[in-house]
Amino acid sequence: MKKEIILASNSPRRIDLLKHMGVDFKVVSPNVEEEGNGEKRSPVEVVKKNAIMKVQKVAEDYRNAIIIGADTVVVIDGEIIGKPTNEKDARRILRKLRGRYHFVFSGVAVMETPEDKVLVSVVRSKVKMRDYSEEEIERYIATGEPMDKAGAYGIQGKGALLVEKIEGDYYNIVGLPLVRLNSLLNRLGYSLL
């Protein structure tokens, strides 16, 4: 019997990326409390733990599936930055990132049930933001786009206009490193191709 593929995420970006790959999958909200925002913990451990928590939670109800979970954070000056809590927080984050490099870490976990085998990996990318103006920050916040994104920007949307350059996996910055995900799926005998 073919296993159902489940994305343990509410992220529209992750959903769009898997759809773009032509994957037949179901979206299930993991309903877990993510850890790490604003903390000085290891971003690698934070995104790994959050991705694993998501697949394990969904696995409780899906016992013949391939479950995919991911978590993404932005790190600057050792601070883990998740999604902004409000517009004031988005403004603070965008000011902190302005004209500087930061790192984006995504943890991706794949769990096969009923075997309950979990594979997890972390991808890191480096992003340099432009020295954008206060007016640009205000216009960007007014779009609403920063509010549900780690680091208060979406590189796949208008946030791309704030970015000067990237080093590493673009899809990692969007929130789902597809090449690494495919590598994990390959180890379980599946493929995005």
UniProtKB/Swiss-Prot annotation:
PANTHER family: BIFUNCTIONAL DTTP/UTP PYROPHOSPHATASE/METHYLTRANSFERASE PROTEIN-RELATED, BIFUNCTIONAL DTTP_UTP PYROPHOSPHATASE_METHYLTRANSFERASE PROTEIN-RELATED
Subcellular location: Cytoplasm
Catalyzed chemical reaction(s): dTTP + H2O = dTMP + diphosphate + H(+); UTP + H2O = UMP + diphosphate + H(+)
Coiled-coil ranges from the UniProt annotation: none
Record-annotated active site: D71
HAMAP family: Maf
Cofactor: a divalent metal cation
Lineage, top ranks: Bacteria, Pseudomonadati, Dictyoglomota, Dictyoglomia, Dictyoglomales
Biological source species: Dictyoglomus thermophilum (strain ATCC 35947 / DSM 3960 / H-6-12)
UniProt entry tagged with the keyword tRNA processing: no
Catalytic EC class: hydrolase
GO cellular component: cytoplasm
Keywords for the protein's UniProt record, in alphabetical order: Cytoplasm, Hydrolase, Nucleotide metabolism
Name of this chain's protein: dTTP/UTP pyrophosphatase
